[in-house]
């Protein structure tokens, strides 16, 4: 059974299967547009140009 599976994978590699195209991994540009930028984050302080509370969605000069 293992030999048959190996032969099938050699003849028809998984990379030959076309992707459906609607998965997030297939559209990196769309994923970048979905991310919230630091300036639009609710904890962003425009005076200090950083977040008051550093968390996963916010970055800036104040956050490590």
From Swiss-Prot:
GO terms for molecular function: ion channel inhibitor activity; toxin activity. This is Conotoxin Pu3.5. It comes from the Eukaryota. The cysteine framework is III (CC-C-C-CC). InterPro entries: Conotoxin (IPR004214). Residues 1-16 form the signal peptide. GO terms for cellular component: extracellular region. The keyword Signal applies. Residues 17-49 form a propeptide. It is found in: Secreted. It comes from Conus pulicarius.
